[in-house]
């Protein structure tokens, strides 16, 4: 995926910046805890393509 596109693309739900995962196969929204797949370098920002991410809750006690 082109770096310029990554700088301007946002989550279609909360409008925050998306980040590439380590394997460069998904775009991640840290606010919504979801990811969107990349198909041949093209982001698929459709609701039916979302993958919900597991989030860890840290207990400070």
Swiss-Prot record:
Xref: InterPro entries: Trm112-like
Pfam family, one: Trm112p
SUPFAM superfamilies: Trm112p-like
Transmembrane regions: none
Alphabetized Gene3D superfamilies for the sequence: 2.20.25.10
Domain of life: Bacteria
Family the UniProt entry places it in: Belongs to the UPF0434 family.
HAMAP family with a match to the protein in the record: UPF0434
Identification of the protein by name: UPF0434 protein Bfl377
Top-level taxonomy: Bacteria, Pseudomonadati, Pseudomonadota, Gammaproteobacteria, Enterobacterales
